[in-house]
Amino acid sequence: MLLRFPQPYDFELSTGRFRDYRSDRATVWHDGALYRVVAGQEVRVSAADGGVEIEPWGEAAAGEIGRLLGLPFDLETFRGGVSDPTLRSIVESLPGLRPTLNPQPFEALVVAITTQQISLHAAASIRGNLVERYGVRHEHAWEFPTRERIRELRPRHFTPLGFSRAKAEYVLELAHSDLEFDALALVDDEEVIAAVTSVRGLGRWTADWFLARHLARPHAWPAGDLGVRKAVSRFYAAGGSLSIEEVRRMSERFAPFENLSAQFLLAGARMAG
């Protein structure tokens, strides 16, 4: 059944990161389609006129896939409101791009932990090992390990998967924490940051990306992310290297669309090579 998207929407362009990181086992690109397990059932997502085709259809599948593919973003208002000429040029060059999200909060934070201080490809690889070992396999994709499943583990279970001792402990701290994910969706950005950073191993960078890539908060600006710093430096510092604080101050330039601005700057940097 068709899940409609505001047009223009380019499925191939918007899902490029899933093809780039094929070691991701929770959201799998295979033979022109995405596969993800939703509520215990594998769902196939493919391009269709006016949106995407979801098989099998269900309310849970439509909700999760819509969030995965960035439906919460108000791109029409963003595209019409971009005033910065450099960013506007990037946005106009990518008319069908809709940034993606991670629809599950626990998974989103584990993803953030795995990407700390290593390349995205290396992070995807060790995360894939975790999902294969402790998730539930379906035909193409694996169901991401639940918080309850991770609580059963010890640091020694993570070492063969490529995790450092510290990252293993951070994932376990998260699993055993008092964070109430549903409640985080209902509070303001500063409260989310305070709650996330109260867990050992989760700092401001992790909180910013959680706001940006899970909650789709419009003002999220992950200045501490190396990719964002490189993208901002590329387009606004003539290839020089801006500091975290310099990048953080630049968020005012893109208000009130900081999150989508960061996503499009990253996309522009990737497209430019």
What are the language-model segments listed below?
Residues 1-273:
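HhH-family (HhH-GPD) DNA N-glycosylase catalytic core used in base-excision repair
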